[in-house]
Amino acid sequence: MPAPYKRKKHSGKRPEDSHDAKRPKQKHGRQEMRTITRTARRVRRDEEGEEDEQVEENVNEELESQDDDIEDGGDIDDDKGKAYDALLTLLSGDHQEDTKKNTSVRAEPEQTQESESESDEDSGDDEIAGANVDDDKDVDEEGPEEDDGDDDQQDPFEVHFNQVSDTFIEEQEKVLKDKPKWTFADKKSMEDAGYTYTFQVPPNPIKTGGKVKGQSVNNYSIKQRLVSPFEKQHPESLNELEGVLLDSMVKYQDINYVYKTFDNESYKKLYVLHALNHIFKTRDRILKNNNKLHSYQESMKKGKTNIEEPELRDQGFTRPKVLILLPTRNACYEIVELLIKLCGSEQQENRKKFNKQFSSKETPPDSKPEDFKHSFKGNNNDFFCIGVKFTRKSLKLYSSFYSSDIIIASPIGLSMILENPDKKKRQYDFLSSIEVLVVDRANQIEMQNWDHVNTVFKYLNKIPKDFHDADFSRIRMWSINDQANLLRQNLVFSEFSTPNINNIVSSKSSNLSGKLRFKPVTTSKNCIMNSIGLKLKQIFQRFESNSPMTDPESRFKFFINSVLPSLTRSTSYDDGLLIFIPSYYDYLRIKNYMKTSTKFTFASIDEYTSQSKLSRNRQQFASGKIKIMLYTERLHHFRRFEINGVKNLLMYGLPSNPIFYKELVRFIGKSVFREIADLDLSFIKILYSKWDAVALERIVGNERAPVLCNSVNEMYEFR
């Protein structure tokens, strides 16, 4: 058996598990918590910013390393909390702690500028790397930006954020409260790309112009200072799919995009370009309005009292405008590298520290599948939340959240700041003015714990408790009126769709510019079933379910009343039955029922099972001492075990990842190869309902899925 992949450790308790859990101590530098709520105009802060100044040394608040990990395991009363603790117990004692001694960092004079105050300490695995919630105001190096000549009133940025009237927003808010049906404004099939997309709009949407088509980013509303670096890094022309994606992004429409294969990363360059474009356009708008106010003030000083004071609303409550949620530090490292390449900054502050905390050359074992190696390569620690700030000539990492332009975080890292057990230390105001939200590699995040994503949404665009020296004369009225969610753009990227992921755009989004859903075309030719390579009996058994809400209960009753009683009678072997259960909560319920209400000899392995018990149960199942074994989807995701001795397979539900279906079926193929099972006697049985249509389509193709879900017959067999 190959050695288990050693994944980075992290904190062993979620905040909701115990309010008494040990928390990382914080090391405070300068801390100025401002509660100023003045509404008078500020004196222009950047008047003297013409000359190139050295960026003021930052005094970052860093979380102190914790040497003693919180113990994993133990009894957990709240089943909801178990979904994340499962992974922690699974990995305890299984991974190595980085014990390298810390070394001080010397400043690099050229490309990378390190702050003198920076100590290049490794962020402990239990720390939230990058966390800096100081309310300090860094000195901006902002001078007048070079004019790209793109101050166009037809620019989607202007149309979406600056030209919408207060009356329009108020009317739309009232309409959307009644939950009207969004209409399909467009539907198209892109045969060459293998996609279809649908575009939905609310009643009376924001109209950001017609479709733009072009093979160059120059055809889109992108700032010229970004076009050259982008074309230098990516000289190839945009294909049709990339063009539609970029056009939708710059028009601030919501996107739910399934990138189909784990190694498809072409979309990342587009959303990074869009995020930078949004940041630079926001900054340029503010600087130009500063100049207008300065001109007005100069005119007033000269005695010109007949000039009307301009009302220039161009900001939110706080500076951060883009939030990017990612599953691991390595994913964050890759996005920051893209930001650096595309932004054209001459200096990058704290880059050496960032590389040390976020990058790693570690790779999973070669025995693991390619998608597993892609997901867990590099530093796969999932505790991080880092601010990124842009000035005229530099990019600054580890900036205070309140002076950052972009915040890149894992959902768990961010949620532990938002809902710190110590209420006095909770911070969420820096999310009050997020205008572009990106959720990338959403399937990986879902396997960690989707509850943390829901926590983040709870605090997005929430009116801040403190106003952090905000200038209310510059804040847009839709921010003040708590209507920012109507204009926030949500970009969601996943390898395959699930109800949780679809829910972000379908239910949590109220974007008045509309929403697009990109769906890959899965046919009987390219579906996962067609790639297995085994002529094995595959039985699909449908059960009746009245609604998605009652589906778990209907599935359980069908299993205990119809499937379980005939389980041993319907198989040709009295051992080697693997029961795969996607949901951990269903797994607990079945495990308890089989233990208390049946006489089956069975074992179970899940996210909480200790390493010794995992090995023992797998060995006893392979030898036939244990007849039945329960196996969870999340355990398979994080460990990718090769289960020996499988002769028959029962899927309590369809796996969310179609690759898992192929891997599970091949467990039987391995037994056939070892001549402990016969291909004609072994079988797979899959339980499903009509609500599983999306997952079913990935397995059998879009031609068969409607038949399996809606026809009279309830059982179908494939080979």
UniProtKB/Swiss-Prot annotation:
Gene3D superfamilies, per database record:
P-loop containing nucleotide triphosphate hydrolases
In which domain of life is the source organism classified?
A: Eukaryota
Q: Where is the composition biased (Acidic residues)?
A: 48-78, 111-155
Positions with biased composition (Basic residues) = 1-12
Q: Where in the cell is it found?
A: Nucleus, Nucleolus
Q: Record's Gene Ontology CC terms?
A: nucleolus; small-subunit processome
What name is this protein filed under? Answer: U3 small nucleolar RNA-associated protein 25
What is the species of this protein? Debaryomyces hansenii (strain ATCC 36239 / CBS 767 / BCRC 21394 / JCM 1990 / NBRC 0083 / IGC 2968)
Supply the gene name.
UTP25
